[in-house]
């Protein structure tokens, strides 16, 4: 299952690819917007709410989340409520990057550089870092 949300339908990216996934039926896709315009055929609401409505089964599953930090925080909280472990949850921190080469130091958190050591990390790895991200 893929839960894909945006503020509005205009903010959705990869629209053609998402339409192909919706048609293909190989993967369940839940499209959601915070604010829907007239005629929006999919869900209206926030991604963390969708997580609790879809209730993905943590057995043989990983969760990958990206987006605004506040959304990630609540998605992770809901995944934990559903039984996902820290090793099954991954997120990205590219918002902290600037040069992308590890030279400017902007993305340094504890002893890692997000640009060089990530930008995708397990929740377990993030919990071992100072809460600077």
Regions found by a protein language model. Name each.
Residues 12, 101, 125:
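Short acidic, gly/pro-rich beta-turn/loop elements at beta-sheet edges
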Residues 70, 94-119:
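Local cysteine-cluster metal-coordination motifs and their immediate loop/turn environment
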Residues 75, 107-108, 132:
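Short alpha-helix boundary/capping motifs
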Residues 120-133:
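Short microdomains enriched in Cys/His and/or Lys/Arg
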Residues 18, 80, 113-115, 131:
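Alpha-helix termini
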Residues 1-98:
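FNR/FR-type flavoprotein reductase catalytic core
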